[in-house]
Design a protein with these regions (language model features):
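Signal peptide-directed extracytoplasmic domains
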Residues: 33-194
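Short alpha-helical segments used as structural interaction elements across diverse proteins
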Residues: 8-9, 50, 71, 323
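N-terminal start-of-chain detector that recognizes signal peptides
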Residues: 16-21, 64-65, 88-90, 142-146, ...
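Bacterial extracytoplasmic/cell-wall-associated proteins, especially those involved in peptidoglycan
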Residues: 53, 130-140, 148-342
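N-terminal type II signal-anchor transmembrane helix
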Residues: 3-43
Length: 342
C-alpha cells in the first residue's frame, strides 16, 4: 500500500499518454488542415479524368499542385470509407487548399460546371459554336458526332443528322465530356418533352415524327411570335395538301448554309434538296431545333385557310388567303420600308 505522500505511477502514465497523443495530433492536424504559402498562389484548375480510381485521383491532384500530402489524403479516404465517392471533373482552387479541403471538394463533387443555353431555332452549327464558346467541345468533333451514322442509329434519329432533335434548353455540363455524351443529353431531353400525347397527335395527323419536327423547325425559323406559329403551321399544311411548293425562305437559307439570314434570287433558283421553291413537299429534314411552341403548332395548326404570309419587318406577319391579297400586303410592306428609309 502506498502512503498519502507516495507518487502515483498511473497518473504519470495517463499524463504521459495524453501528452504523447497531443504531440502526435499536432503534426497530423498540420498535415490535414495546414495550407501552403499563399503569397504567389494563382488560381489552379485540375482535371480528374473520368473513371479514375483513387491512385489516379491522387496523382492528378498532386501533379496539379493542389495536394501537398498524398499519403495523408489516402489515409483520410480510407478512414472515411469514401474511395467510391471521389468524383471526376474539373476542380478550381482559388487559394492554397489543405488536404482536408481537397478531400472535401472531391468527395462532394464540387466541380466546375458549364451552362450552355440552346435557344429555340438554333441549328446544329449554332450549337457547335456555343459549345466552343463555352470551351466544352470542338465544333468539328460535335458536328462529326451529330452526323455520324452510328450515333444516329444508336440514338434512333431518322435522317442524316441530329438536326431538330437537340432540345432547346439550358444544359449544365461537366468536363471532361465527349461530344457524343452532349448529343445524347440533348436528344434525351427532346424525347422527354415530346410526350406520348404528342406522338398520338402526330399519328392521327398521318405524320411521322420526322415530318412533325421538320414542319416545326420551319415554323420556328419563320416566326418568333408564339401566337403566329399555328397560323404558319396552317399555311404549311394547306400548301402540302394542295401540292403547292412551300416557298419558305429559311429552308433555302439552310440549304445554302447562308446563316446570316439573307437569301438571293439566285439562291431561290438554285436546285437543292432544301429549296422549297423548286421542290414540292417538305425538305428532307429539319432546318433547326424547334421549341415546344413550334412543335405544338406543327401538331395543332390554326383553323385557317391562309396560303401566304409576308413580314411586316417588325417580327410579325400579314397572312393572306389569295395571291391578290398577298401581293397587296407585299406592296404595303415595301411602301412602308421605303418611307422608313427616307
Amino acid at each position: 500500500m502506498t502512503g498519502p505522500g507516495a507518487p502515483r505511477p498511473y497518473r504519470r502514465t495517463a499524463w504521459g499518454a495524453a501528452a504523447a497523443a497531443v504531440a502526435a495530433a499536432i503534426p497530423c492536424a498540420f498535415l490535414l488542415f495546414g495550407t501552403g504559402p499563399s503569397a504567389d498562389w494563382q488560381d489552379r484548375t485540375v482535371t480528374v479524368p473520368r473513371g479514375s480510381r483513387m491512385p489516379e485521383v491522387v496523382s492528378a491532384l498532386h501533379e496539379g499542385g493542389v495536394l501537398r500530402h498524398p499519403t495523408v489524403f489516402r489515409a483520410l479516404v480510407y478512414l472515411t470509407i469514401t474511395s467510391r465517392r471521389l468524383h471526376y471533373g474539373e476542380y478550381t482552387f482559388s487559394r492554397p487548399p489543405s488536404t482536408f479541403d481537397v478531400w472535401k471538394k472531391v468527395v462532394h463533387g464540387d466541380v466546375v460546371t458549364y451552362k450552355v443555353t440552346v435557344p429555340p431555332g438554333a441549328n446544329i452549327y449554332d450549337v457547335a459554336a456555343l459549345l466552343r464558346e463555352h470551351s466544352v467541345a470542338e465544333p468539328e468533333a460535335f458536328l462529326a458526332a451529330a452526323t455520324s451514322p452510328s450515333e444516329l442509329e444508336r440514338l434512333e434519329i431518322p435522317g442524316n443528322s441530329a438536326e431538330g432533335y437537340l432540345s432547346p434548353e439550358t444544359y449544365t455540363l461537366v468536363k471532361p465530356v465527349t461530344p457524343e455524351e452532349i448529343l445524347e443529353d440533348m436528344v434525351r431531353m427532346f424525347r422527354k418533352k415530346f410526350t406520348p400525347e404528342m406522338e398520338r397527335k402526330a399519328k392521327a395527323s398521318g405524320l411521322s415524327l420526322h415530318q412533325v419536327v421538320t414542319i416545326a423547325s420551319i415554323i420556328e425559323k419563320e416566326t418568333g411570335i408564339d401566337g403566329e406559329k399555328p397560323l404558319v403551321s396552317a399555311v404549311i399544311r394547306r400548301r402540302l395538301a394542295l401540292g403547292m411548293p412551300l416557298q419558305m425562305d429559311p429552308t433555302v437559307i439552310y440549304g445554302a448554309k447562308r446563316f446570316d439570314g439573307t437569301v438571293t434570287r439566285k439562291d431561290l433558283r438554285t436546285p437543292g434538296p432544301y429549296n422549297t421553291y423548286t421542290n414540292r413537299g417538305l425538305p428532307p429534314g429539319p432546318i433547326a431545333n424547334p421549341g415546344m411552341a413550334a412543335l405544338e403548332a406543327a401538331l395543332t395548326p390554326a383553323d385557317a385557310d391562309y396560303l401566304y404570309f409576308v413580314s411586316r419587318n417588325d417580327g410579325s406577319h400579314t397572312f393572306s388567303r389569295t395571291l391578290e391579297e398577298h401581293n397587296r400586303a407585299v406592296e404595303a410592306f415595301r411602301r412602308a420600308a421605303r418611307e422608313e428609309e427616307g
